[in-house]
């Protein structure tokens, strides 16, 4: 999995980078076919925003999160990605089971 982390109006420090990689490792443990990840951290007024785009076979998964604290925004983003990938995985499995039943 190739990971690209960038920041707009915020310096991406090593602790922030490590925290993002730790959360992405948790996400990858649920869905191991992620090929590329683009994470963008932004600061707009008083809100910390994080956007992520995951490339997976058959498309991509996009999630956004914002919070007053960057670490909390990263946590919320990881939760959203987890939910979306679980939904995608369940959908793929149900399609395979439906095709096998025919």
Swiss-Prot record:
Keywords: Translation regulation
InterPro entries: HPF/YfiA_ribosome-assoc, RHF-like, RHF/RaiA
Gene Ontology terms describing biological process: negative regulation of translational elongation
UniProt signal peptide: none
GO cellular component terms, A-Z: cytosolic small ribosomal subunit
Superkingdom field: Bacteria
CDD domains membership: RaiA
GO molecular function, one term: ribosomal small subunit binding
NCBIfam families: yfiA
Subunit structure: Associates exclusively with 100S ribosomes, which are dimers of 70S ribosomes.
Function: During stationary phase, promotes and stabilizes dimerization of 70S ribosomes by the ribosome modulation factor (RMF), leading to the formation of inactive 100S ribosomes.
Similarity section: Belongs to the HPF/YfiA ribosome-associated protein family. Short HPF subfamily.
Name used for this protein in its record: Ribosome hibernation promoting factor
């Amino acid at each position: 999995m190739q990971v690209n982390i960038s920041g707009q109006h915020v310096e991406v420090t090593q602790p922030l980078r490590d925290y993002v990689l730790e959360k992405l490792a948790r996400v990858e443990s649920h869905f191991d076919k992620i090929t590329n990840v683009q994470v963008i951290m932004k600061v707009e007024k008083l809100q910390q925003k994080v956007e992520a785009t995951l490339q997976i076979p058959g498309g991509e998964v996009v999630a956004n999160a914002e919070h007053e604290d960057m670490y909390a925004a990263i946590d919320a983003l990881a939760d959203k990605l987890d939910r979306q990938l679980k939904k995608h995985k369940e959908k793929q499995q149900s399609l395979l089971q439906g095709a096998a039943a025919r």
